[in-house]
From Swiss-Prot:
One of its GO terms (cellular component) is cytoplasm. Mg(2+) binds at residue 257. It catalyses: tRNA(Phe) + L-phenylalanine + ATP = L-phenylalanyl-tRNA(Phe) + AMP + diphosphate + H(+). GO terms for biological process: phenylalanyl-tRNA aminoacylation. This is Phenylalanine--tRNA ligase alpha subunit. It comes from the Bacteria. Binds 2 magnesium ions per tetramer. Keywords: Aminoacyl-tRNA synthetase, ATP-binding, Cytoplasm, Ligase, Magnesium, Metal-binding, Nucleotide-binding, Protein biosynthesis. One of its GO terms (molecular function) is tRNA binding. Its EC number is 6.1.1.20. HAMAP family: Phe_tRNA_synth_alpha1 (MF_00281). It holds the Pfam family Phe_tRNA-synt_N.
Length: 357
């Protein structure tokens, strides 16, 4: 039996492939193998001989099976190593192209506005988008019968029956932030208030939600001349022109007196807007001297301090500067549109390096 063991273990050690291993298995431990034939002879032996030969044959069979399995695993590992040495995989293929995000034109316009007015000493203030009707209307000298307070123009928040809290609205302008700024900071004061506002209107040039920036300057002896200079410098910087002509038209806003709508001289030759030249006029904002009642509502003595205010539609200015024809496209969430009109997110505007590059 020792000779049989040495014979098959030697063959297993010299086997070069799985076919040779299988042939050895069949010859040694297969149904017709040499060890199987020897186990059939156990029945012809005496009980004493079987007690000795049986365990010895089983041990030999187990040892040969273990040697076969180990050799088979070794051959498989060797084959894998050879395949890894011979095969070549290109791992330098380019990665999937990932598009960079861009800054929305409204966000860009807001950053440009902020940069310009910051150079003039204005700080930025923000306020709640849901506000009481006192801040949105009463404090701004807008009487109860004014059309702007009608439900067809203003979004009122629902109040349950018996709710005694003051009515709340989605703010129709950012002017309420002026009142809150006066209450918080007092005078003198120079502040701009950019943000989203809401009105019940929807067409090519109006949306239920849009963006405004309000400006407020309070000090002793402020006049319309200060307002005119501020707006001229702003328009020149925003549209990046050396000279601009503004036209102030008398108007009426409850929160300013006197009030003026401001037009800029422009040209539409060839369908392209050119600021500061031509014979056309384009309305861009409303302005005026702050009404004494509004100053008083902010907790400041109107006999001591005067000021000017202005309101600018950020969306409208973005349309004019960037050549965007339809206001509604701002809110369509179209990535193709945003890739075309968007701006580099990290290219922050400033007056020295340029606003929109």
């Amino acid at each position: 039996m020792d000779d049989l063991k040495a014979k098959y273990l030697g063959q297993i050690a010299e086997a070069a492939d799985e076919a040779a291993i299988e042939a050895i298995r069949l010859a040694a431990v297969g149904k017709k193998g040499e060890i199987a034939l020897m186990m059939r002879e156990l029945g012809k032996m005496t009980p004493e001989e079987r007690q000795t030969a049986g365990p010895a044959l089983n041990a030999l069979k187990d040892e040969i099976n273990s040697a076969l399995a180990a050799k088979k695993a070794a051959l498989a590992d060797a084959a894998l190593d050879e395949r890894l040495r011979s095969e070549w995989l290109d791992v330098t293929l380019p990665a999937r192209n990932r598009r960079q995000g861009t800054l929305h034109p409204i966000s860009q316009a807001r950053e440009e506005l902020t940069a310009i007015f910051a150079e003039m000493g204005f700080s930025v203030a923000e306020g709640p988008r849901i506000d009481t009707d006192w801040y949105n209307f009463d404090a701004l000298n807008i009487p109860g019968h004014h059309p702007a307070r009608a439900e067809m123009d203003t979004f009122y928040m629902h109040r349950a029956e018996g709710d005694n809290r003051p009515p709340h609205v989605l703010r129709t302008h950012t002017s309420p932030v002026q009142i809150r700024s006066m209450e918080k900071m007092g005078a003198p004061l120079r502040v701009i208030c950019p943000g989203g506002v809401y009105r019940a209107d929807y067409d090519q040039t109006h949306t239920p939600m849009f963006h405004q920036v309000e400006g407020l300057a309070l000090d002793r002896d402020i006049s319309m001349a200060n307002l005119k200079w501020t707006l001229e410098e702003f328009v020149k910087a925003f549209f990046e022109v050396d000279d601009v002509e503004l036209r102030f038209r008398a108007s009426h806003f409850p929160f300013t007196e006197p009030s003026a709508e401001v037009d800029i001289r422009c040209s539409w030759e060839g369908g392209q807007l050119k600021i500061g030249e031509g014979d056309d006029w384009l309305e861009i904002l409303g302005s005026g001297m702050v009404h004494p009642k509004v100053i008083a509502a902010g907790g400041i003595d109107p006999d001591v301090y005067q000021g000017f205010a202005f309101g600018i539609g950020i969306d409208r200015l973005a349309m004019l500067k960037y050549g965007i024809p339809d206001l509604r496209a701002f809110f369509d969430s179209d990535l193709r549109w945003l890739r075309h009109y968007g701006f580099a997110a990290l290219d922050m505007p400033n007056l020295h390096g340029g606003l929109s590059r």
